[in-house]
Amino acid sequence: MSKVCVLTGKRPKYGNTVSHANNHRRTRFEPNLHTKRIWIDEEKRWAKVKLSAKAMKIIAKTGTAELAKLLK
């Protein structure tokens, strides 16, 4: 299962978790992804996509036109 946002391209990042004692251990930071059904007006159909929280805000502001271009 891919952990990549369709609209923004966000993907997991790698870094360190640092404790109070300054011990470092490697960790994977996952993007805040959700599987959503979005209605595409131009094509009159539902599209099931993985979106980050930021992508959902972008769609709320601009509409689904950008997303429709990416899904073609």
From Swiss-Prot:
GO CC annotation, single: ribosome
Keyword Magnesium: no
Keyword tags: Ribonucleoprotein, Ribosomal protein
Signal peptide: none
GO-annotated biological processes: translation
GO molecular function: structural constituent of ribosome
Superkingdom to which the source organism belongs: Bacteria
Protein family membership: Belongs to the bacterial ribosomal protein bL28 family.
Listed HAMAP family: Ribosomal_bL28
Name of the protein described by the UniProt record: Large ribosomal subunit protein bL28
Species of provenance: Chlorobium luteolum (strain DSM 273 / BCRC 81028 / 2530)
Gene: rpmB
